[in-house]
């Protein structure tokens, strides 16, 4: 019998993906249905519902749920949910009661079928203000919301695609059922998830090792969906993380895996979503460091810590493992945090993924206070293969500029 935390709001995972003959029959039927194009973010949400990562959702949210999530961080039933999971369209021809095929907006591949239970409009500015705490169009999350269609479509879905993630990422891509089976096989009860969209530098390594000390194991969980321009591709990140695990962690304490969502860059609210779906993956804790899921200086460095104190005690079973600002201290001779290092700012080398990418993009060597040499070698090889005209300018803003 499992010792892991149960799925969110349910005794069992709710995987919406069809298999076998049911999948074959539904795919054929879907070819005859009206098509709704999906964005990359929407497709990632569909795949996540397919594998049960968004348990207990059965499809896209209606207006009452959208409003309640924006205003109260709960769906209408009262169940905790921090970010709206919605589907949009400009299609005037589909209406409540219609059945539609949801397709990849670029390839036309059928991803899912849906029975439309509601067609409604939203106040996009309200969603941006409540979820992202800004309406500035420079924010990538605001860009996503403002690019949505005129209408939202709600309804239950049947998922007919895995998005190609298993083929592209092989064993790195694991479903909640698979990670839970892995944890059970290892006999782990407490598992901390480490969310990353970057290769792991020394500060990340330090955070994970703190978690290894207090939990049975750690799942390093990488974003496999779309990121912003200039971020490092998942295959490169995975290789860099693998060499770190092989050389600097004890065997059988770490699982590296990935999940299919796009980043929303919603800072504190996204930290809550990260904890919620990690509960579905079987994790008892989420490591929350500096500026979790943030971008530039839209959020305070520890807003994602504070938001966990603002929700009800029973909102989530997965708890935040909050860790203070970490850095290399020359006087301490190693990694430290604000809680453990008594020295001054002049003695500290503050680390960030943005700062590492900036140095790599500028063809600078990474000091060992920033990165393990094995990791640096992988990243330098990747950046050496990027043509100058294809490089994205990386600016140090907000916390990364310190």
Curated annotation (Swiss-Prot):
EC number of the protein: 2.7.7.4
GO molecular function per UniProt: ATP binding; sulfate adenylyltransferase (ATP) activity
Enzyme class: transferase
Keyword Lipid biosynthesis included in the entry's annotation: no
Taxonomy, superkingdom: Bacteria
Keywords: ATP-binding, Nucleotide-binding, Nucleotidyltransferase, Transferase
Pathway membership: Sulfur metabolism; hydrogen sulfide biosynthesis; sulfite from sulfate: step 1/3
A single BP term in Gene Ontology: sulfate assimilation
Coiled coil location: none
Catalytic activity of the protein: sulfate + ATP + H(+) = adenosine 5'-phosphosulfate + diphosphate
Pfam families cross-referenced by the UniProt entry: ATP-sulfurylase (PF01747), PUA_2 (PF14306)
Protein family per UniProt: Belongs to the sulfate adenylyltransferase family.
HAMAP family per UniProt: Sulf_adenylyltr
Cited PANTHER family: PTHR43509, SULFATE ADENYLYLTRANSFERASE (PTHR43509:SF1)
Protein known as: Sulfate adenylyltransferase
């Amino acid at each position: 019998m499992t010792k892991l935390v149960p799925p969110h709001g349910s005794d069992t995972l709710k995987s919406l993906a069809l298999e076998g003959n049911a999948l074959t029959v539904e795919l054929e039927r879907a070819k005859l249905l009206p098509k709704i194009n999906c964005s990359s973010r929407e497709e990632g949400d569909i795949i996540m519902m397919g594998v049960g990562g968004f348990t207990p959702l059965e499809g896209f949210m209606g207006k009452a749920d959208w409003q309640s999530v924006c205003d109260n961080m709960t769906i209408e039933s009262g169940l905790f949910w921090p970010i709206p999971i919605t589907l949009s369209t400009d299609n005037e021809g589909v209406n409540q009661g219609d059945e539609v095929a949801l397709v990849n907006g670029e390839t036309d591949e059928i991803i899912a079928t849906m029975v439309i239970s509601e067609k409604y409009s939203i106040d996009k500015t309200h969603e941006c203000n409540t979820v992202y705490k800004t309406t500035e169009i420079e924010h990538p999350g605001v860009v996503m919301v403002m690019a949505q269609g005129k209408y939202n479509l709600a309804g239950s879905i049947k998922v007919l695609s895995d998005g190609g993630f298993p083929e592209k990422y092989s064993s790195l891509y694991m479903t909640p059922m698979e990670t839970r089976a892995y944890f059970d096989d290892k006999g782990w009860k407490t598992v901390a998830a480490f969310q990353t969209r970057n290769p792991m530098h020394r500060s990340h390594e330090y955070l994970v090792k703190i978690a290894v000390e207090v939990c049975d194991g750690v799942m390093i969980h990488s974003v496999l969906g779309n990121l912003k321009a200039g971020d490092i591709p998942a295959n490169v990140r995975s290789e860099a993380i693998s060499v770190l695990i092989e050389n600097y962690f004890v065997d059988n304490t770490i699982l590296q895996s990935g999940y299919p969502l796009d980043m929303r860059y919603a800072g504190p609210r996204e930290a809550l979503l990260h904890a919620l779906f990690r509960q579905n993956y079987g994790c008892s804790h989420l490591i929350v460091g500096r500026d979790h899921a943030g971008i530039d200086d839209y959020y305070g460095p520890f807003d994602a810590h504070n938001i966990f104190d603002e929700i009800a005690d029973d909102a989530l079973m997965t708890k935040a493992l909050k860790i203070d600002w970490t850095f290399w201290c020359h006087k301490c001779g190693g990694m430290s945090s604000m809680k453990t290092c008594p020295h001054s700012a002049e003695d500290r080398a503050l680390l960030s993924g943005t700062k590492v990418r900036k140095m790599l993009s500028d063809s600078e060597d990474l000091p060992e206070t920033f990165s393990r040499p094995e990791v640096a070698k992988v990243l330098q090889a990747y950046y050496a293969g990027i043509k100058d005209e294809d490089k994205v300018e990386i600016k140090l803003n907000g916390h990364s500029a310190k």
